[in-house]
């Protein structure tokens, strides 16, 4: 590959700054498109790539501005442009993107401290050369690790954009853009590429059901699947019950411990095996001895107990800390019933009763046993991970209402379950990619108790911060990047940015994606449907890409308004006669 052929010549560098260079074009004819030896070159129009020749390093740049000198603007005409090659001398501004070795043009690096000299020659860049550079982004030394996805074509010159899947997902990925910009197609395309190019598995959280045609291996929460409450973590249960910190939370925790003791005792046929653990006027020794012997199972941070007895157990926990023996205070046994402590629990008891008896929560969490016709989503995920016949699992939230924060809490519980699997190295040898569509519905959500103390649902945030090294990669798709927690957004190594209009959204991307400079972000409001700006840690320069159609398209088409049908005159006359 020889990028510095005189047949590709465009002009000379006449000004150099840390951000851009200015180019002098000896003739306006040099800006036109041309072909050489069957290879198409885009010339020197705005948005096109050019290469700049240096002594040791060459430079790839993108033209972002063209203009004529003031003295030549008044004489411009169609005839003068076409027939007088020396009448016009345009100048342009080009953004420096990356540098490469003159002796090994395939090896690229980011432009930091190297700049072209005044008088350096500028050449048009071929599609082939751009394809080679893009393919080098994120390339690993081990060839077996280099898995490439046919993501789309560059908008400037239709060069194929084959990017490394390890570069896209290795440090998590975010797909952002306003509605109708093409996010759903991009998600579907990435899923297609992962499934067709690798043996890795994909879990897709589908908020609206638009990906139903992507795979037949689907679980719809609230319809044919439920999340067993026994797999909730204690914090997840607290999100649902919202206990107050000082008066209700300690009693609730003790109630949960007691019910876990009851469950384990039943399994061992112990004398403690009753439905609720009675404490009033009872000896403490047997309980604490049993507790110490099974402390690992009891303090496992799960809700593996019979929640239908929780209200009764809360009342049993409302006792004085010490009892009496022969009219003397005895710390070895609990005291009698404490009505004042129980009064503080009445609002909590009411919330528990509402939770257990609410139909939607029973369908989702199975408080009264597995709902009819529903399978456990935990068993479904475990089966999906351990068996090799399926690569995609779609988990649909389309039938879950937004009331009571049930959608956010259930998604957070599901993310906590996957986070726990990742922490146990389930995905280290065979990484899993977790796609979250409409991520703004699940992330950056807070739950408030009756005293308006806020608790953050942070499972997805923890996945973004922890799970890269465990082999679980997160891919978020959202309309509003400003609604994603800044801690989560800053962990994203790759951004695929569709059309963005809101200034706050653009600033959130600019602050999170270091390589997305102002010149690249200026294209965001005018991007067409399916066009996106690809930026990331492993991409030395931003890429404007037209995403290819996915094999299985999501149901994201906008319903069309239809023209009103004219009423036939004969029908009008018959109506008058009636």
What spans do the regions from the language model cover?
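Loop/turn-to-beta-strand initiation segments
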Residues: 199-203, 389-392, 429-433, 470-475
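Conserved ATP-driven motor cores of ASCE-family P-loop NTPases powering translocation/secretion/packaging/pilus
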Residues: 238-244, 456-457, 461-546
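Conserved AAA+ ATPase small/helical "lid" subdomain
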Residues: 252-274, 523-552
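Conserved P-loop NTPase motor module
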Residues: 302, 313, 320-322, 529-578
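Helical "lid/switch" subdomain of P-loop NTPase nucleotide-binding domains
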Residues: 207, 211, 233, 432, ...
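P-loop NTPase motor domains
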Residues: 213-215, 229-234, 239-459
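Glycine-rich phosphate-binding loop of nucleotide-binding enzymes
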Residues: 146-227, 486, 508-509, 534, ...
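Basic- and hydrophobic-enriched, low-structure N-terminal and domain-boundary segments
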Residues: 1-176, 190, 428-430, 445-448, ...
């Amino acid at each position: 590959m020889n990028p510095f052929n005189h047949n590709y010549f465009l002009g000379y560098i006449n000004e150099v700054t840390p951000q851009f260079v200015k180019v002098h074009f000896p003739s306006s004819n040099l800006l036109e498109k041309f072909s050489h030896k069957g290879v198409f070159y885009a010339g020197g129009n705005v948005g096109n790539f050019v290469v700049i020749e240096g002594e040791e390093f060459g430079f790839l740049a993108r033209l972002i501005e063209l203009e004529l000198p003031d003295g030549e603007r008044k004489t411009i005409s169609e005839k003068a442009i076409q027939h007088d090659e020396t009448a016009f001398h345009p100048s342009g501004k080009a953004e420096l993107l990356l540098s490469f070795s003159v002796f090994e043009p395939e090896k690229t690096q980011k432009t930091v401290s190297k700049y072209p000299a005044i008088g350096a020659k500028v050449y048009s860049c071929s599609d082939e050369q751009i394809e080679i550079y893009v393919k080098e982004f994120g390339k690993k030394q081990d060839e077996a690790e280099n898995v490439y996805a046919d993501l789309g074509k560059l908008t400037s010159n239709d060069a194929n954009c084959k990017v490394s899947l390890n570069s896209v997902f290795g440090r998590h990925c975010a797909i952002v853009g306003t509605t109708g910009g093409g996010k759903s197609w991009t998600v579907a395309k990435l899923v297609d590429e992962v499934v067709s190019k690798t043996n890795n598995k994909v879990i897709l959280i589908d908020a609206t059901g638009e990906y139903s045609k992507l795979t037949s291996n689907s679980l719809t929460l609230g319809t044919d699947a439920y999340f067993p409450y026994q797999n909730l973590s204690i914090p997840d249960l607290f999100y649902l019950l919202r206990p107050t910190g000082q008066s209700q939370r300690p009693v609730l925790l003790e109630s949960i411990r007691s019910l876990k003791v009851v469950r384990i005792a039943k399994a061992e046929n112990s004398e403690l095996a009753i439905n609720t653990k009675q404490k009033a006027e009872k000896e403490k020794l047997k309980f604490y001895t049993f507790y110490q012997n099974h402390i690992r199972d009891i303090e496992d941070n799960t809700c593996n107990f019979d929640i239908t007895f929780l209200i009764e157990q809360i009342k049993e926990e409302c006792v004085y800390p010490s009892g009496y023996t022969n009219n003397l205070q005895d710390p070895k046994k609990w005291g009698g019933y404490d009505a004042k402590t129980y009064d503080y629990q009445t609002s909590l008891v009411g919330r528990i009763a509402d939770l257990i008896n609410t139909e939607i929560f029973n369908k989702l969490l199975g408080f009264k046993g597995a709902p009819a016709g529903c399978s456990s989503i935990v068993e479904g995920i475990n089966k999906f991970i351990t068996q090799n016949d399926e690569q995609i699992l779609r988990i649909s939230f389309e039938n879950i209402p937004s009331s009571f924060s049930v959608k956010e809490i259930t998604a957070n519980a599901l993310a906590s379950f996957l986070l726990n699997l990742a922490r146990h190295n389930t995905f280290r040898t065979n990484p899993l990619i977790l796609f979250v569509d409409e991520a703004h519905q699940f992330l950056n959500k807070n739950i408030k108790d009756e005293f308006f103390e806020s608790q953050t649902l942070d499972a997805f945030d923890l996945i973004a911060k922890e799970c890269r090294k465990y082999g679980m990669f997160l891919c978020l798709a959202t309309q509003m990047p400003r609604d994603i927690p800044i801690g989560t957004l800053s962990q994203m190594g790759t951004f695929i940015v569709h059309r963005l209009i809101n200034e706050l959204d653009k600033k959130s991307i600019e602050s999170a994606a270091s390589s997305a400079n102002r010149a690249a972000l200026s294209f965001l409001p005018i991007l067409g449907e399916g066009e996106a700006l690809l930026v990331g840690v492993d991409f030395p320069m931003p890429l404007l890409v037209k995403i290819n159609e996915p094999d299985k398209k999501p149901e994201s088409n906008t319903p069309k308004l239809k023209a009103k049908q004219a009423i036939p005159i004969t029908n009008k006359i018959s109506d008058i006669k009636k």
